[in-house]
C-alpha cells in the first residue's frame, strides 16, 4: 500500500508545503511546518488533480500548498497569477497547467481587495507600509494598534510605525499589493492586500518583474481545472 501523497498539516495551523518534485521514479514530498522537514518517497508522481481529489472535503479552506517543482523551474515573469477571492486561493500557471496553488487572506469587509487585472508597479524585498501600522507615544508605548496614517493622529513625541510587508509587489496606486503576511484558511483578514505565506511570496517574488500581470477575480478563473464541466442541455 503506497503512502498517501498529501501530508496533513500540523495542529498548530501552520502552512504546509506539498511539493511535487521532478524525478518521478523517486518522488519526495517536503513538508515545511514550524521548521520541521519530513520526506516521503513514492513510486508515482501525484498531480494537481490528485491534490484536489485528496482535499475534496476541505478545499479551498486548507492551509496546504501545492507546488510542482518542474513547472516552477519553467515559470517566467509572463506566467499568469490568479487570485480568487471566493476561494481565498492563489494560483500560478505555467504552460496552461497549475504550477502552484496556495492559501491567501485578502481584504476584509470595508477594505475589500479590488477585482481586476493589474500589472506589478513596484517590487521591494523589504517594505514598510506608509498607510497601515501602529502608533507609539514618546515612551514607545503603543497607543493605536491598527493605525491608518491618513486618519489617526500621532501624539507629540510619538511615531507612526509602518507594518512590515516582505516580498512586496505593488498592484494599485492606493497601496494594494501582494506580500508576506499572516494567512488563515478561507479568511479575509487584510486591509486590502493579498497576504501570502512567506515561502510562496518569496517564490513569486523571484519569478515576477515590474509589469507582470496579476488577475484578481471573485470566482475561480476559467482555466482552473477544478471548475465543473458545462452541463448538457
Predicted features along the sequence, with ranges:
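Exported/periplasmic cell-wall-interacting domains
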Residues: 39-46, 111-115, 134-233
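Cell wall/extracellular polymer interaction/catalysis modules
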Residues: 40-160, 166-167
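A broad, low-specificity signal marking well-ordered, structured residues that form hydrophobic/aromatic
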Residues: 24, 81, 102, 118, ...
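Polybasic, lysine-rich low-complexity intrinsically disordered segments
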Residues: 2-3
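Bacterial N-terminal signal peptides
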Residues: 27-36
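Bacterial N-terminal signal peptides that target proteins for export
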Residues: 14-28
Amino acid at each position: 500500500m503506497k503512502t498517501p501523497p498529501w501530508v496533513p498539516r500540523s495542529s498548530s495551523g501552520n502552512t504546509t508545503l506539498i511539493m511535487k518534485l521532478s524525478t518521478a521514479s523517486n518522488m519526495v514530498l517536503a513538508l515545511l511546518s514550524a521548521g520541521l522537514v519530513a520526506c516521503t518517497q513514492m513510486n508515482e508522481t501525484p498531480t494537481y488533480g490528485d491534490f484536489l481529489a485528496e482535499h475534496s472535503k476541505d478545499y479551498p479552506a486548507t492551509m496546504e500548498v501545492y507546488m510542482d517543482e518542474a513547472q516552477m523551474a519553467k515559470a517566467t515573469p509572463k506566467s499568469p497569477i490568479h487570485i480568487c477571492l471566493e476561494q481565498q486561493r492563489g494560483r500560478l500557471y505555467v504552460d496552461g497547467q497549475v504550477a502552484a496553488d496556495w492559501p491567501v487572506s485578502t481584504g476584509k469587509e470595508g477594505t475589500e481587495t479590488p477585482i481586476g487585472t493589474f500589472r506589478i508597479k513596484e517590487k521591494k524585498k523589504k517594505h514598510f507600509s506608509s498607510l497601515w501600522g501602529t502608533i507609539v507615544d514618546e515612551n514607545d508605548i503603543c497607543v493605536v494598534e491598527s493605525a491608518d496614517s491618513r486618519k489617526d493622529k500621532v501624539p507629540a513625541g510619538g511615531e507612526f510605525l509602518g507594518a512590515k510587508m516582505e516580498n512586496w509587489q505593488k498592484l494599485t496606486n492606493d497601496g494594494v499589493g501582494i506580500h508576506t503576511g499572516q494567512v488563515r484558511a478561507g479568511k479575509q483578514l487584510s486591509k486590502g492586500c493579498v497576504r501570502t505565506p512567506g515561502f510562496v511570496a518569496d517564490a513569486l517574488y523571484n519569478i515576477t518583474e515590474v509589469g507582470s500581470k496579476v488577475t484578481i477575480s471573485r470566482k475561480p478563473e476559467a482555466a482552473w481545472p477544478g471548475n465543473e464541466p458545462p452541463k448538457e442541455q
